[in-house]
């Protein structure tokens, strides 16, 4: 049984592979932490800031561009995973349904998944699909950490107010969910999210 005691070197992240179907996923071994969120919530930007590698995860002004599960290797055993964005109205329903089925299969069956980071724009938190994803993850007993991104777009007081409102809304889940403020622009919350990821990676298999 392999144990991961030290924090991974996020700056060592390298693109590994992409999967459009469940059977295209890399071997289910080691440890993975996945990122998911609405299109344009800042998911790719968060991955780029966390790793310190500009352009690692492709960002786009066009929501819905990430249509596959993208894997980034930190080392031989540990990976960050960029799940398809959801909630973009211009994506055909058939395509959207395929994404949902792929993500659901990943969350349900991926044994090496250590935790799920749910990325939400702080100005539009807890949309219906966000709540659906949280329900999926809770049902599959996956730890969840919520990033309220783009916190620099609000005043400090407004950001703290929204943080409190979301905390109240998810309080029924207890310790299964944690959350924080985050900004890729001014790096608010960067050390905090890295600490959460490192704790998950160090957890027992």
From Swiss-Prot:
The entry's keywords: Cell cycle, Cell division, GTP-binding, Magnesium, Metal-binding, Nucleotide-binding, Septation
Signal peptide start and end residues: none
Family indicated by similarity: Belongs to the TRAFAC class TrmE-Era-EngA-EngB-Septin-like GTPase superfamily. EngB GTPase family.
Recorded name of the encoding gene: engB
Protein's job: Necessary for normal cell division and for the maintenance of normal septation.
Protein name: Probable GTP-binding protein EngB
PROSITE patterns per the UniProt record, alphabetical: G_ENGB
Reported cofactor(s): Mg(2+)
Residues bound to Mg(2+): 44, 66
GO biological process: division septum assembly
GO cellular component term of the entry, any: cytosol
Stretches assigned to the EngB-type G domain: 29-203
Native source organism of the sequence: Coxiella burnetii (strain RSA 493 / Nine Mile phase I)
CDD domains: YihA_EngB
Binding of GTP, residues: 37-44, 64-68, 82-85, 149-152, 182-184
Keyword Cell cycle: yes
């Amino acid at each position: 049984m392999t144990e991961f005691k030290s924090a991974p070197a996020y700056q060592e992240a390298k693109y590994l592979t992409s999967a459009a179907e469940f059977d295209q996923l890399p071997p289910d071994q080691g440890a993975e932490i996945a990122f998911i969120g609405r299109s344009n919530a800042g998911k790719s930007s968060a991955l780029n800031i966390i790793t310190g590698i500009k352009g690692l995860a492709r960002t786009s002004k066009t929501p819905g561009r990430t249509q596959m599960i993208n894997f980034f290797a930190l080392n031989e055993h540990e990976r960050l995973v960029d799940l398809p964005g959801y909630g973009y109205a211009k994506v055909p329903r058939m395509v959207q349904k395929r994404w949902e089925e792929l993500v659901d299969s990943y969350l349900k069956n991926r044994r090496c998944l250590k935790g799920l980071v749910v990325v939400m724009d702080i100005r539009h938190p807890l949309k219906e699909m966000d709540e659906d994803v949280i329900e999926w993850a809770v049902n599959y007993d996956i730890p969840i950490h919520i990033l309220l991104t783009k916190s620099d777009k609000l005043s400090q007081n407004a950001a703290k107010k929204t943080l409190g409102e979301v905390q109240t809304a998810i309080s029924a889940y207890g310790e299964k969910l944690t959350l924080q403020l985050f900004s890729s622009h001014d790096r608010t919350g960067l050390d905090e999210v890295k600490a959460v990821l490192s704790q998950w990676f160090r957890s027992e298999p």
